């Protein structure tokens, strides 16, 4: 049964028998296999639906052709708006550091960050995954000074809200706290903790947007809710949904890959 196995940081579709890995043919069987002088655990696992995997697990998806880890963050994401069956994926690490917007506008709607996530970023994913993204209904405010409830918008990929991260400083709730919120408070880029944007307008830092700021504390790392100015270079962290019926396979390290 073909599936993806990470070998030396690269995902290979292994069918069993003789497989080509890094230009060399190897005889692959379930169990231990010696590849390039290193022993790997090879298991031909059973395909399972994405929505049966415990939130917090890692799913590897190709980004610009290379495997990147994503948290399986929530099943039936915002089901009142999206219906049942959509699973939220959040990039484990930030993609890069970038400004929220290039003009003095403190809202997410059509900001530089919003435009990049919804328009450019999805094209980095494999076409087979991109076609499954569709549009996800999310909530955010269209104006820093608007009262009442946040608006409802559809996006292919987006930044999380401060509410979803467990924060309380937004003008009003945008969605609900994610079951793995505590795992998302600290964001990293190239192994270094960094601040990450949210799509939320802050009730305390008007017209800024909420950000989770990394604080240096001896021997610990702590994510705290704070504020970020429009041009600050903070972390972009793509999130999107995939069908819960998508078949995935567990690897020997406990992570998952999309079934071939």
Predicted feature locations:
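Collagenous Gly-X-Y triple-helix signature in extracellular proteins
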Residues: 2, 43-260
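Intrinsically disordered, compositionally biased repeat/linker segments
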Residues: 1-44
